[in-house]
Amino acid sequence: MAAPLRPVPPQPAPRRLPTTAPLGHDTSDVLQQIMAITDQSLDEAQARKHALNCHRMKSALFSVLCEIKGKTAVSIQFQEEDPPDAQLLRLDNMLLAEGVSRPEKRGRGAAAGSTATPGGCPNDNSIEHSDYRAKLSQIRQIYHSELEKYEQACREFTTHVTNLLREQSRVRPVSCREMEHMVNTIQSKFSAIQRQLKQSTCEAVMTLRSRFLDARRKRRNFSKQATDVLNEYFYSHLSNPYPSEETKEELARKGGITVSQVSNWFGNKRIRYKKNTGKFQEEATMYTGKASTVTKARRPRGQSSCQSTPSPGPCGPLPLTNGSDVVLTLRTLAFLQPPTGGVCLQPLVHSNWQRAAPQPASSPAGESGSFNWDAASN
């Protein structure tokens, strides 16, 4: 007898795999949480940081991050010492030479360097360099003020980044060398600002030097006092307008200018006078009158009436007993009373510095126009 048929057991239902979120969804969720950090208040951020530091899995998280960094981090090439910036060195040397910046280390030459005037100017009280020193002092003050602001901003930003990296080193691995590398990177970025500041300062100093100290600059006029002193000496010594070195120093002291300026003024004045003598006759008359007034004021009262005029008088014809009086009288006659039919008298002293007009051959020996200037000068 056949065995009874057994019912077929039902097949088990297929297992459903658990639904997993796509990988992109997790990444976007993490990024969204990171972006939400900026919207948190300071209290919320401090609370989250405290919760993370107190979490029992913090050490495990730090170990995983160290392992990941060791596998994927790109090795950073650290330089022992960055090469110095050649442009910054040139700018520093220029600012130091012009007296704008101060040397970092002061040695034996500090005393000698402190006595020198900034910018290579001599230690004189001449008017020519007073404006230059005042402007240079303003540039120096602005430079040090801006440099101090730059250094303060660089220190504050560097300190902020260093503190931030130290805070992050509690969660992720950050080495000391990486902190130093980040600080050097920040300072190199700030050096561009320092370079621009020093470049602008050097340009300002060079512009100042070209305006005040360049030999090719526009000629500056002397003061009225200096001009009067020089002109008075020139016209009172018209026969020999070549002052000695002692006289130049005295004129420079009276006019408040330098000896070199006195020498240049006399050289230019002699050239201009020889080129256009007639133009300077009025000026010569004015300064000659000043010189004669000073001469009369210095003489005794008893002699002033006899020596104050070149015309014949009670003291005899042409009573001139002094060589300077002869020169003064002849110059006055030459400029104020030119003879008719003759020529004006011209000085012939000091290697004919001023060429005289030729004497007419027909002039008699007794004419006033044929007066022998050399004999009078001697």
UniProtKB/Swiss-Prot annotation:
It comes from the Eukaryota. Pfam families: Homeobox_KN (PF05920), PBC (PF03792). Residues 109-120, 356-370 have a biased composition (Low complexity). GO terms for cellular component: nucleus; XY body. It comes from Mus musculus. Its main location: nucleus. This is Pre-B-cell leukemia transcription factor 4. Residues 22-214 form the PBC domain. The gene is Pbx4. Belongs to the TALE/PBX homeobox family.
